[in-house]
Every structure is written in structure tokens, then in C-alpha cells.
């Protein structure tokens, strides 16, 4: 009987440790809005919650919509950089939440691709960004999303 109780305690404590470890990982994912429907499709993941990369081809008339999701809704992403590189010398406009273009008013560092801290209540804000092409040709694109820091908003 004692052996059975000890095994049960060991199993329960192992499950508890595994659940706590899974909560400590703040996964980061990049989702793209589907062209044919209004659904968001997961295109890239980052287990460490710091960096993810996604490659795609943009046609000359494409308007690409993305959102960055985090697994832990009690944290917000601070110092988030979105870098878009192109094989060709392409020009793209990056727009953040509510289709506001990245400019000096919402980009404290004065360059497109930097998202300042998102002020929000617990889990209420998800960074969205869109990419509009102003070129006449197709281009291969690489998206790199980097988060330097996280801020704990609240305890649930």
C-alpha cells in the first residue's frame, strides 16, 4: 500500500512539474490571413519566444496581413522588431495595428519595422502588421520577428 501511495505521489508530482515547465515557455507564433477566407493560418513558430523566421513570395499586387501571437497572455512583447528583407531591391510599406503606417509618431526609433511597447490590459493586445507592395514585380521575402524583452502584466 505504501509503495502504491509513493508511486501515485511521484506520478502527480511529475505531472505538476511538467505543467509548470510548459507554462514557463512563452511560445511566439506568426499567423497570416488567408487569401481565400477570413481565417488566420499559422505560418511560423518560435519555441523560445524570442525569434521566428518566415519566407514567402509576394506578388506585385499582394497585400499581406500578419499577426504575432504569444502563448502566455499575461505578458506583452516589448522591443519587438519586424524585419522584412527581399531578394530584389523591393519597396514595401509596413503598417501596424489599425493599418497605421510605421512613422515617427508610432515608431520612436524613426524607422519602419520597430514596434514600441504595447500598452494594454492583460492579454488584450495582439500586434498586427500588414505589408503592401508598391512594386511592379514579384519578390521573395523573408520575415524575421525578434522580441528582446517581455513584461509581465498580471497574475492569473
Swiss-Prot record:
* Cellular compartments annotated: Secreted
Which cysteines form disulfides?
none
Per the UniProt entry, the signal peptide is 1-27
Q: What is its main location?
A: secreted
So which residues have sugars stuck on them?
20, 83, 103, 106, 134
Q: Name one GO cellular component term.
A: extracellular region
Which key words tag this protein in UniProt? Glycoprotein, Secreted, Signal
Query: What domain of life?
Result: Eukaryota
Quote the protein name from its UniProt record: Uncharacterized protein DDB_G0281771
State the organism of origin: Dictyostelium discoideum
Kindly list the organism's lineage.
Eukaryota, Amoebozoa, Evosea, Eumycetozoa, Dictyostelia
